[in-house]
């Protein structure tokens, strides 16, 4: 159950004055950016902005005059929704739950003992009980995983642990469970190139044997209940992260963090769990239905390796090369008690970054208040971005096998440009929006959303954010 108790150490943002007058010319503020950080942002006389990512070295140029173009998709005219298809628009929809593999967990709305609204995580519901509760979000294995069950079995000697075998046997002990597993395995085999006749001729035991990854796999999907917003009348009214309520978004993150914990705990060879969200097909989504993915891998990954290299040179690099630079260049957008949001720099796509200020760098170990703080700022970033903008949400966390402390940070990247020959030939990425353009767009929209009551309480926006250098406490 998600409860409001704060079980972790407090991470209070200093209420001292932020340098709200800070602008791009950091020469006016000697000593604000740490001397170990080479200049990541340069504005040329013609208005061109050159950026370099302090962790990856990615080079980005923003040329003037292109920052006011609309960002969202150009779509055909909206089509009315068929009421008879409510909850059945795609394989992730709430009335098609038997088209996804057996659930690992779901989060449902409930009432606490004192009558207050709360959330509860239910684990491994049986096939015949899926309709007994209404999941706001549900965690299921990815039918087409990046790393298959056989990858772990053949390369690492992985076998289903006893708990997973027990859950598999219990699920298959009922006719509803067996029928569900047979049907989903058959769907996967047909999609993989088997003919319908071949699949139909397979013995049940062979179909069941192919389901091991449903109970011990390492690529999960966390699926939202809604495909369209409540009351939608046409197919342009998709339900996105930003159309959730702040409470719903918190539940979304809580179930995802719980899934991270579980993947690390159940597969010893896992070195890192990558968490991401692809929104809309131009950003890589298979369905225009809100979901996050978790992929466990047996390496820490190149992104973490680059960050760890910088971290070992400078243990405060996430302050010196990220937050402090954002403060110096007036890129801070918002903050609350345990997190800060700013316009990112040195990214291939325009990016909004949310950093946890907690000393705890792994989401599932953070207190309820710390997790909620990141959730509220990330929800605000999505709401300000809007449901028509393709985006990738990327989580970056400390791998459990790494001793060096790292902050939990989330990047929301707007997929509003297409890589072409210039980028491939030069490795210089051209963006239409500078970090200041991103800041201005998000700030303007946040003020509108706050006036409409759509944001969580406790958020300080713009000059009121009162963010100062060195506030990330991951190295405490």
Feature names for model-found ranges:
Residues 2-289, 295-361, 384-396, 400-476:
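Active-site microenvironments that recognize anionic phosphate/pyrophosphate groups
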Residues 252, 370-374:
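Hydrophobic alpha-helical membrane-association signature
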């Amino acid at each position: 159950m998600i409860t409001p108790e704060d079980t972790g150490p407090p991470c209070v943002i200093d209420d001292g004055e932020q340098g709200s007058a800070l602008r791009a010319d950091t020469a006016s503020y000697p000593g604000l950016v740490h001397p170990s950080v080479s200049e990541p942002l340069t504005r040329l006389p013609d208005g061109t902005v050159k950026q370099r990512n302090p962790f990856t070295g990615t080079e980005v140029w923003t040329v003037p005059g292109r920052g006011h173009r609309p960002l969202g998709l150009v779509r055909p005219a909206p089509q009315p929704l068929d009421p008879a298809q409510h909850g059945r628009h795609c394989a992730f929809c709430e009335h098609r739950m038997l088209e996804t593999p057996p659930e690992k967990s779901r989060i449902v709305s409930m009432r606490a003992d004192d009558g207050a609204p709360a959330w509860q995580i239910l684990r491994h519901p049986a096939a015949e009980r899926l309709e007994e509760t209404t999941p706001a979000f549900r965690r299921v294995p990815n039918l087409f995983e990046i790393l298959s069950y056989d990858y772990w079995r053949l390369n690492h000697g992985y076998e289903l642990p006893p708990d997973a075998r027990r859950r598999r046997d219990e699920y298959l002990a009922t006719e509803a469970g067996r029928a569900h597993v047979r049907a989903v395995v058959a769907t996967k085999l047909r999609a993989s190139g088997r003919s319908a006749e071949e699949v139909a001729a397979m013995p049940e035991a062979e179909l069941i044997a192919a389901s091991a990854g449903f109970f011990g796999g390492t690529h999960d999907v966390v699926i939202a209940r809604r495909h369209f917003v409540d009351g939608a009348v046409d197919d342009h009214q998709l339900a996105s992260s930003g159309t959730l309520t702040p409470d719903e978004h918190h539940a979304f993150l809580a179930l995802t963090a719980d899934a991270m914990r579980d993947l690390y705990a159940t597969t010893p060879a896992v070195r890192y769990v990558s968490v991401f969200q692809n929104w809309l097909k131009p950003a890589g989504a298979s369905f225009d239905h809100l979901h996050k993915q978790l992929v466990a891998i047996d390496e820490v990954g190149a992104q973490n390796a680059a960050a760890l290299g910088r971290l070992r040179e400078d243990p405060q690099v996430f302050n010196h090369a990220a937050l402090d630079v954002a403060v110096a260049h007036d890129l801070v957008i918002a903050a609350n008690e345990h997190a800060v949001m700013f316009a990112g720099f040195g990214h291939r796509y325009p990016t909004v970054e949310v950093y946890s200020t907690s000393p705890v760098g792994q989401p599932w170990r953070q207190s309820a208040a710390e997790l909620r703080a990141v959730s509220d700022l990330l929800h605000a970033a999505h709401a300000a971005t809007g449901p028509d903008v393709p985006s990738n949400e990327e989580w970056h966390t400390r791998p459990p096998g790494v001793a060096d402390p790292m902050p939990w940070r989330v990047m929301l990247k707007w997929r509003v440009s297409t890589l072409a020959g210039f980028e491939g030939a030069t490795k210089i990425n051209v963006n239409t929006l500078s970090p200041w353009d991103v800041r201005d767009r998000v700030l303007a929209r946040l003020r509108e959303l706050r006036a409409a009551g759509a944001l969580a309480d406790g958020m300080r926006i713009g000059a009121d954010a009162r963010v100062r250098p060195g506030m990330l406490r991951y190295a405490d």
